[in-house]
Regions:
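Proline/glycine-enriched tight loop/beta-turn segments at coil->beta junctions
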Residues: 66-73
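Short beta-strand element of the alpha/beta-hydrolase
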Residues: 73-79
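Acidic/histidine-rich catalytic neighborhood of metal-dependent amide-processing enzymes
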Residues: 83-191
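Extracytoplasmic
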Residues: 58, 71, 110-112
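Soluble non-cytosolic domains of exported or imported proteins
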Residues: 3-10, 23-34, 89-97, 124-128
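A non-catalytic alpha/beta surface segment that caps or lines the substrate-entry region
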Residues: 8-66
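A mature extracytoplasmic/lumenal domain signature
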Residues: 50, 67, 80, 121-123
């Protein structure tokens, strides 16, 4: 099972890892957006959320997974743009590959809560895609149970002191880059 998952994650990375900055690598940006649209569209109700920046239209890709629950929504997102000159292998192809496999898993196995997966655009320019989408949620008064942002999931360095923190935090967290952190307004937890 894990070999198959590993193979699928690798296949996604082969398609996503490329320069895909929306301003300097528009062909790569378009290619990855269409790949995500195709992959996400297999698993539930797919739609686009359009927003504008500097007079141009950009697109967040949204998948609502099948679920009849009236419970508050769980939102899971990852961004698909990159900084200029970067293929974005870890920032954020790894998050997108996991997002696509979550689509597969929850498309085949209904969750107890409704789940919405979103591939955000223009995150590298000030979180513009997620801000535009959060404004839409606020306008529609959408209840959320939680939001998970899948960001840079593929890096691991077990060498001591490979992870740095501000001085006041260094005693609370590991000094190796081999963990996943979850944060909210209320707490930070390490896995």
């Amino acid at each position: 099972m894990f070999d198959l998952l590993s193979d699928r994650l690798s296949q996604h990375l082969e398609q996503i890892v490329r320069e895909r900055n929306p301003f300097f690598s528009s062909q790569g940006h378009f290619y990855v957006r269409e790949y995500l649209r195709q992959e996400l569209g297999q698993w539930g109700k797919f739609e686009s959320h359009f927003f504008t920046f500097q007079g141009k239209v950009y697109e967040n890709l949204i998948l609502d997974l099948p679920n009849n629950s009236q419970k508050p929504l769980i939102l899971i997102g990852a961004h698909y743009d990159t900084v200029p000159g970067s293929q974005g292998a870890d920032d954020n192809a790894t998050g997108l590959a996991v997002l696509l496999e979550l689509a597969r898993f929850f498309g085949e196995n209904q969750a107890n809560y409704p789940i919405r997966l979103i591939a955000f655009d223009l995150e590298e320019y000030g979180l513009l895609g997620s801000i535009a989408y959060s404004e839409k949620l606020k306008q529609t008064k959408q209840d959320l149970r939680l939001m998970l942002s899948l960001e840079m999931l593929g890096y691991c360095d077990k060498n001591p002191h490979s992870q740095k923190y501000p001085a006041f935090l260094e005693h609370f967290y590991p000094n190796t880059e081999d963990f996943i952190a979850g944060s909210s307004r209320f707490c930070v937890s390490m896995v």
